[in-house]
Structure formats: structure tokens, C-alpha cells
């Protein structure tokens, strides 16, 4: 008996079928001689073939189909026809004895199963060539899809891909298309990162090669003051004055005093004055002396072509007593008045000085008011006429007490003097002198020949006017008054 190969079967299937069928009669003929050996060999033969087929394709669909055919289940078209023919063959030989029928049924069933398994494998290879991907095991396709999911989740965050039940062709196409779809998105991310610009918020964060923006250039205009010589509060005040400008006359006066002027068209421009101090409106308090550091103006042009002394603000030239350092505003009044008087220099300058002197003298005692006309009529270092009698000299006050002489010398300058009658019996006359430590009374001694001298080592004079005339040009020979001369005579109210 020889099996005819099916139309879809390959050459290998025909060879296997012919081999099995040609071997069957020989084995059946020898069944009488060694039935036990043949039965054992036929039982092991299909099992070996099954093991080889399952090892070649573990868990494949062919194994399941062979198992179904053994259990009597449905299978594919060619397998089903072969199974039915095998069943008919077995039923036709039912009349054989029990031993022979058992041998023939087992041997034929094993051969049919082996031939059917290989035939179905080859027929699937030829007939189902376009759908090869569908025959892949579910475990393998799940493994491929899992790899694709991990790749897409890490790179793109997308998980909407086909499940394990999808075909391998769609999974392979998605796997092949995923790198190409990820490519443009990665490129877009790189382009976005390249287009990002660094925003610099502060000037301290700038590297040395950073380009400055327009906002930074606007913030660093000329109006900003970043000097290190002045305190922070002074910088803020100066910046505010430069921006808004100040119409306060006191501030302009201080500008005249502190800043050099630039002459233009024969005059001064108030716009060119450097604003170094703030107004009282901005501060809420008067400007202080030490608001700005000492900056001497060297050779700078001043108003009316006069230069201010560069060391006028030095501490050693400060005329204030130690107790007045806490009251700078009162002391600065005279300085502000001098600053305001810069524009009035010329013919009005002498009258301004006289007014200052008169104002100073008004604040003194009533004795100064009495002596004020006498002081204004005589200049410093007035010459004495030695030929004029003593009674006609303006500095002779006659018989006045010691206390009265001191009171008359009190408002006078240092080295002021007067001559009076002495209260002591040793001399007739005495000279009252104003020194830095108070009033000194010098006794004029009279010799036996009616001449006058101050001490035993000094010169001798014939009259008191000659003594006064001599010591108005020479220094007095007394301890504590070696550097003094009789400079400022105090006129008597009788003359």
C-alpha cells in the first residue's frame, strides 16, 4: 500500500509516505515470526518521530494538531481526510484476530500520525506562506511587543501599541517605524534647547563675555551714582538731585562753595553746577558738614575769577569749639552767607564786611556799644605822637579804677591798651594791657630825676607819651608779654 501525496504536499511528504507504506507490508509479513519485536518497534517509531518534531518546533501549532488528531478532534482539511481514511482502514480490518488487529491498528496509527504531522508541516509552509507571521507562538509575539513597549515608554512616553494578540507583521512594522518616528521629536527637542537664551537678572551674575541688554544699558546711565568714596545714603541723595534738580537756594549756594564752575559766554550757567548736596525737602534735615568727602579744587575756575583756598575745609582750620561739633547748622550759617555773597563781589563787598562787623558787635555788652565809634575811627597799629602832652593823648583815661580799666579793655582786641593814674603810691601812672590771658597792669616807674621807665634794665624816657611811642614799635620787656607791643589804643570818652 502506497499513499498518494496531496496536491499541496511537498516532495518530502511524498517520500515519507512512500517510505512508511513500503515498510508496512514487510513488517506485517514478518509479524508471525516476531510479533513482540515488531509491536515494540512500531510503538517506539512514532514516538521518536514525535519527539523529533516537537524538539524541532517546541510548543508549535503542529503538536497541538497531532494531539487533537489522536484525541479524535477536528484538524485542517488534509489532515482530516487522512484521519478519516485511517479510521476506515482500521474498521475494514476489524475482522482480523485480536492479536493481529491490535498490531496492525497500532502500527498503522503510528505511521499515519508521523506522516500526517510532517505533511501538515510542509503543507503549512507552502499554502500559508503569506500568513507566516500569524503562526508564531503567542509567547514569542508577546516578548517582541514587550520590548517595543519598554523602548517607547523610555523615549517617547507612548504606550498605545498593539497587544499580544496583534499580528507579528504589525508589531514588526511598528518596531521598525518607532525609531524613525522618534527621530524628529528628538531633533525638535534639541532645536528647542538650542533656541533657549539665558536671562540675566542682575549685573553681578554676568560673565565677562556676556552681552549687555538694552535694559542694563538704561540702568547704567549717567544719572546713576556708583562712587565708592561716598556713603550709600549720600549716593542716593546725589542721584535724586541729579535726576530731578533742586531749586533750593541753599543747595545752589553749597554748589557754589563746593563745585567748580564753567564760564560760558562771559557768565555762569546754573545747569553746569555739580549738585553735591541735597535740599532740606529731600532730607527733612539741614545738610551736614561731613556729608561729602574732602575734595580740594586745584586750579578750578571760580566765580569772578577767584579761587577758593583748597584747605579751607581741613579740620585744622575749623574755628568751631569742641562743644559745637553737634551743632553744624548754626556754624554753617556764616559759610552759607559767604557762598551767597560770591555773586555780589565787587563794590558791595566792603559794605558787607562792615555790616558783619557791626552785627558781631551788637551781640556784645553795653561797654562795646560805647566804644564802637572809637574803634571804627582808628585803625590797627595807630601811631602815637610823642610831642603831644599826656592830657591831650586819646589813650589817657585819667583817674579810673583798676576794675574800670579792665571793663574798658574787655571788648577790645588783644594788645589793646590805655594809660591811667596809678592807685599805688610807688608810681603815678600805669599801663593796662589786654592779653590772651586777661588784663595786665604795667607800672611806669619814675626815677629821681623825674624820668620814666618800665624796669631797671629798660630804657629811660622823659615823658609818658615817649614811653608809649617806643613800646608801640618794640616788644614789652615782661615775662608773659615778650611777644606783645602796644598796638590798639583805647580812646577815652572824654576826647
UniProtKB/Swiss-Prot annotation:
GO terms for molecular function: phosphotyrosine residue binding. This is SH2 domain-containing adapter protein E. It comes from the Eukaryota. InterPro entries: SH2, SH2_dom_sf, SH2_domain_adapters, SHE_SH2. Residues 162-181 have a biased composition (Low complexity). Residues 51-190, 203-233, 256-327 are annotated as: Disordered. The lineage of its organism: Eukaryota, Metazoa, Chordata, Craniata, Vertebrata. Residues 148-157, 208-224, 301-327 have a biased composition (Basic and acidic residues). Residues 395-490 form the SH2 domain. CDD domains: SH2_SHE. Disulfide bonds: none annotated. The gene is SHE. Keywords: Phosphoprotein, SH2 domain. The modification Phosphoserine is found at residue 107. Residues 135-144 have a biased composition (Polar residues).
